[in-house]
C-alpha cells in the first residue's frame, strides 16, 4: 500500500470539521452544507481513511506474528471501513469526533477457544506495551456482552500514530456475528445497529448465550439451539416479512 501522507487530509481539526459537515448533511439540522462542502468533506475523510492503510498492514502483521509465536491457527482478516459506513456511524453517534474514531482500520483473528483468544490478547498487548510505551485499551465483550448479544474482545492500539482496532473472537462468536450480518443483508434491516423487531433481537441474544455455553468444535445438536437457528433462517429467507414485523398493516 502507498505510504501515508498526512498533508493529504490536512490536520485532525480538518477531519473533525469534515465529520461535522457529513453529519449535518445527513440529519438536515442546523446549517445544511452545500453540495460542494459535502464533496470537499468526503475528500478529506477519504484521504484520512487512506492514511490508515499502512498502519493497518502493520497491525495485521503484528497479529500474525502473535499467532505464530503462540503456535495457533486462526482465520485472520483486515479491512478499512468504507466511506458510507463511516458516514453512517457519524450520523448514528451525534457526539462522535471523526478524528478520534478508533475502528477506521481493523483486523480480526478467529480462534478455536476462549483460552486461545486470551493467549493472543496477552501477547499482543505485551508487544504493544513495548512498542508504544503505554498499554492498549481493551473492551471485553465476553465478560460483559453487548446488549445485542455480541461477544468478542476488542483491542485499541496504535501503529504509526493511527488508531487501529483488533478484534479477537472464537468461531462460535464469529458465527453469531455472521448470522447478524446475513440477516441484515437479506432483510434490509440493520440488526447490527439495533434496528428491527424485538422478537428477532431476543432470538439473537438467546442464540449468543447458548453458543457461549457450547464446547468448541462440537456441532449444534441441542434442541433449543437448533430451534433458534431454524427460526432465524426462516426470517432471513423471508426478509420482507421481517422488515414489516411489528409495523402492523395500517388497518383498524
Labelled PLM ranges:
Residues 2-45, 49-51, 162-252:
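An acidic, glycine-/histidine-flanked metal-binding catalytic module
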Residues 5, 38-92:
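Surface-exposed, low-hydrophobicity interaction/linker segments
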Residues 59, 117-123:
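Hydrophobic side chains in well-ordered alpha-helices
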Residues 91-102:
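Short, flexible, solvent-exposed loop/turn segments with mixed acidic/basic and small polar residues
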Residues 97-99, 130-131, 181:
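Basic nucleic-acid-binding interfaces
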Residues 109:
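Residue(s) in the substrate-gating loop at a strand-loop-helix junction
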Residues 112-116:
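Helix N-cap motif at beta-to-alpha junctions
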Residues 124-159, 163:
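Short Gly/Thr-rich strand-loop-strand
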Amino acid at each position: 500500500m502507498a505510504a501515508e501522507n498526512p498533508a493529504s487530509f490536512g490536520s485532525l481539526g480538518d477531519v473533525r470539521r469534515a465529520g461535522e459537515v457529513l453529519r449535518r448533511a445527513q440529519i438536515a439540522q442546523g446549517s445544511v452544507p452545500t453540495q460542494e462542502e459535502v464533496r470537499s468533506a468526503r475528500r478529506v475523510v477519504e484521504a484520512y481513511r487512506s492514511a490508515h492503510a499502512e498502519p493497518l498492514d502493520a497491525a495485521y502483521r503484528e497479529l500474525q506474528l502473535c499467532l505464530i509465536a503462540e503456535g495457533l491457527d486462526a482465520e485472520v482478516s483486515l479491512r478499512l471501513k468504507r466511506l458510507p459506513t463511516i458516514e453512517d456511524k457519524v450520523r448514528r453517534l451525534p457526539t462522535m469526533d471523526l478524528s478520534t474514531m478508533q475502528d477506521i482500520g481493523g483486523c480480526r483473528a478467529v480462534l478455536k477457544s476462549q483460552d486461545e483468544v486470551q493467549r493472543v490478547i496477552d501477547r499482543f498487548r505485551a508487544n504493544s506495551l513495548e512498542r508504544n510505551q503505554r498499554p492498549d485499551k481493551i473492551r471485553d465483550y465476553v465478560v460483559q456482552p453487548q446488549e445485542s448479544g455480541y461477544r468478542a474482545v476488542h483491542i485499541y492500539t496504535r501503529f504509526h500514530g493511527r488508531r487501529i482496532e483488533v478484534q479477537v473472537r472464537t468461531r462460535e462468536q464469529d458465527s453469531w456475528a455472521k448470522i447478524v450480518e446475513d440477516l441484515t443483508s437479506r432483510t434490509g434491516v440493520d440488526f447490527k445497529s439495533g434496528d428491527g423487531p424485538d422478537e428477532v433481537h431476543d432470538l439473537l441474544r438467546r442464540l449468543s448465550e447458548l453458543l457461549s455455553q457450547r464446547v468448541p468444535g462440537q456441532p449444534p445438536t441441542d434442541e433449543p439451539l437448533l430451534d433458534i437457528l431454524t427460526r432465524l433462517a426462516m426470517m432471513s429467507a423471508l426478509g420482507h416479512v421481517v422488515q414489516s414485523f411489528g409495523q402492523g398493516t395500517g388497518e383498524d
